[in-house]
Amino acid sequence: MKFKRLATIFSAVLVLSGCGSMHSSGKDLNISLPLKTKSIAPYETDVPVKIGAAESLFKTNDQGKIEKALVKSYHQPNDTTLDIELKDNIKFQNGQKLTAEKVKSSLENSMKKSDLVKYSLPISSITAKGQKLTIKTNSAYPELVSELANPFMAIYDTDAKSDVNQTPVGTGPYQIKDYKQSRKISLSNFKDYWQGKPKLDHITVTYQEDGNNRVRNLESQKDDLITDVPVNKVQDIENNQNLKVSKESGFRTSLLMYNHTNKKMTKSVREALDHIIDRQGIADHIYQGYAKPATSPFNDKIPYIKEPKLTKQNIEQAKMLLAKDGYTKEHPLKIKLITYDGRPELSKIAQVLQSDAKKANIEIDIKSVDDIEGYLKDRSAWDATMYSFGTIPRGDTGYFFNQAYKKDGAINKGDYNNSNVDDLINQLNHTVDVKERHNISNDIIKLSSRDVPNSYIAYNDQIVAANSKVKNYKVTPEGIYLIDYRTTIER
């Protein structure tokens, strides 16, 4: 009897261990991202779109063109009206059908909750009936379709019982099941996804600010896929036969952002700092060739941008400019410069700036923070900051100009303001002709550059690394999309 009981227990252990093996060999993917976010509401972060949890009405394809996503057809009968018909076979992850009324509620709630969305969508009214949606704007707004492709305009069910900040319910192939703030997101596949059954069973996303730690987690197989790979680790990953690197010349620009509310950050000071930056050296040595020196906010791969001449490092010119404001070797300018580890190259740039600035009679105090977005809200706490963002995510300059140069723009952290630049941006917003939009864009670049609103340093490549068993993830210039229903891992 005793032996029978032991045999039964042993059999049970085998069954349980077998079940464990089956689970571990399932299609589970572990992803590591930088840049913590306190909320994962779609209007607060692009993470839900990046990881396949939410979708916008439109999307950007691999060539940077806007195409339909949740939309069956659309028509613009005049400059202020957009008629949309939604696809009829799409469900939210809670089983509710995607209807025009659901989209209306989502967009209106996002505009109410987010300044970025509100100022990107100058909408006067939305009417909904069945699968048909009519959006009217306050005035001519030719880039409305492009803005509706913005991941911050992703559609979610406002009637869902869950908290949109914790577990938003979207239409993507993977449903967010649990969110531990600034630490981890757990997702499961949505079997009724409209494009087909997702290839993965589960996805776990963790936030890891330190780029070197992200690489270590990939090498140890703790993670399967990581973004924003530090350039000094690319060669190590390429030398590992179990890993692979994917690169794409990107639309992300690294920059030195100035606090225009601070009296010491005068135009002379901003010009001096602009002359201190060795853009070519930074691109060659800090980015190790995975970036190009910047001459404006926009990557020079954009064909219609007339790139200004590259500003070369000139320490003597910087000293002369600073002398105008009374700064000398005996009385140096003291600046507090903020940086963060989510993009490790930025901290290295800060250190180079600190060293070079000393030659021009500037003492830079570097402070590294965890929550860069939260920290910059207090403008009394900083003079300048390292920063990085996608300046032209959908092929048009309007997004950047409205968000970075308008006074109430969501990424105008330093409160830059020029009424003449504002007038040109307003003109751009109401201009339909594509060639004329390009001309106005170049006029804005030329006029604003006289103010030195920020110092643009480098255009960064998008660098993603993965276990060689991971297939069909996306690496795109704008860095928005990563996971879709075809992404899989071979176990």
Swiss-Prot record:
Q: What is this protein called?
A: Nickel-binding protein NikA
Chief location of this protein within or outside the cell: membrane
Asked if the Swiss-Prot or TrEMBL record annotates the protein with the keyword Transport, the reply is: yes
What does this protein's UniProt record list under function? Answer: Part of the ABC transporter complex NikABCDE (Opp2) involved in nickel import. Binds nickel and transfers it to the membrane-bound permease. Required for full urease activity and plays a significant role in the virulence of S.aureus during urinary tract infection (UTI). May bind nickel via a nickel-chelator.
Query: Where does it live in the cell?
Result: Cell membrane
Organism classification = Bacteria, Bacillati, Bacillota, Bacilli, Bacillales
Which residues carry the N-palmitoyl cysteine lipidation? 19
Q: How does it assemble?
A: The complex is composed of two ATP-binding proteins (NikD and NikE), two transmembrane proteins (NikB and NikC) and a solute-binding protein (NikA).
Please provide an example of a Pfam family that matches this protein in its UniProt record: SBP_bac_5
| Effect of a null allele | Deletion of the gene strongly reduces nickel transport and urease activity. Mutant shows decreased virulence in a mouse model of ascending UTI. Nickel accumulation and urease activity are almost completely abolished in a nixA-nikA double mutant.
Checking SUPFAM superfamilies in the record gives: Periplasmic binding protein-like II
Q: Which organism is it from?
A: Staphylococcus aureus (strain NCTC 8325 / PS 47)
Keywords per UniProt: Cell membrane, Ion transport, Lipoprotein, Membrane, Nickel, Nickel transport, Palmitate, Signal, Transport
Which GO biological process annotations does it have? Answer: nickel cation transport; peptide transport
* Any coiled-coil regions, as ranges: none
* Protein family according to the UniProt entry: Belongs to the bacterial solute-binding protein 5 family.
